[in-house]
């Protein structure tokens, strides 16, 4: 039984979905200064924006100012901010210190209100998450 529980725990840890306990609303700078959506020592997300791409799809544009020691970026999506699954993966091979832009289209979102987040994996095996972006269709 102990071995089964260990295997189950490993399977959960390596799944492409992630449970978030908190929704963090990004701070909005009212005076328009250069405030980042997310920043830590490994990643700086300059902006992330979701918009309607057609009658059903959602286009997510995001840009990074730097990427350090990161092997993989994953855009995650979900109907709630607490349970998100990977919808797009970018495998990275080198550090970046210049603005990089990414664009992903989620052709069939599950709900009219969707939540998006970037998860990243580091070379040492650690990982991190950005803040969560809420998108409401029709707004």
Place the predicted regions along the sequence by residue:
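Sec-dependent signal peptide recognition
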Residues: 2-10
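C-terminal motif of bacterial Sec signal peptides marking the signal peptidase cleavage site
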Residues: 14-16
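Pro/Thr/Ser/Gly-rich low-complexity, intrinsically disordered linker/stalk tracts
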Residues: 23-68, 131-139
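Recognizes extended acidic, P/S/T-rich segments that occur
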Residues: 72-111
């Amino acid at each position: 039984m102990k071995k089964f529980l260990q295997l189950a725990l490993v399977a959960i840890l390596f799944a492409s979905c992630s449970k978030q306990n908190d929704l963090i609303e990004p701070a909005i700078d009212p005076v328009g200064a250069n405030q980042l959506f997310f920043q830590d020592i490994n990643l700086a997300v300059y902006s992330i924006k979701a918009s309607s791409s057609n009658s059903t799809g959602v286009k997510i544009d995001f840009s990074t100012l730097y990427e350090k020691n990161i092997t993989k970026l994953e855009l995650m999506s979900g109907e709630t901010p607490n349970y998100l699954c990977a919808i797009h993966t970018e495998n990275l091979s080198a550090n970046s210190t210049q603005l990089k832009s990414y664009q992903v289209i989620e052709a069939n979102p599950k709900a009219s209100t969707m939540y998006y987040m970037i998860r990243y994996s580091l070379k040492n095996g650690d990982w991190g998450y950005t803040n969560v972006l809420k998108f409401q269709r029709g707004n």
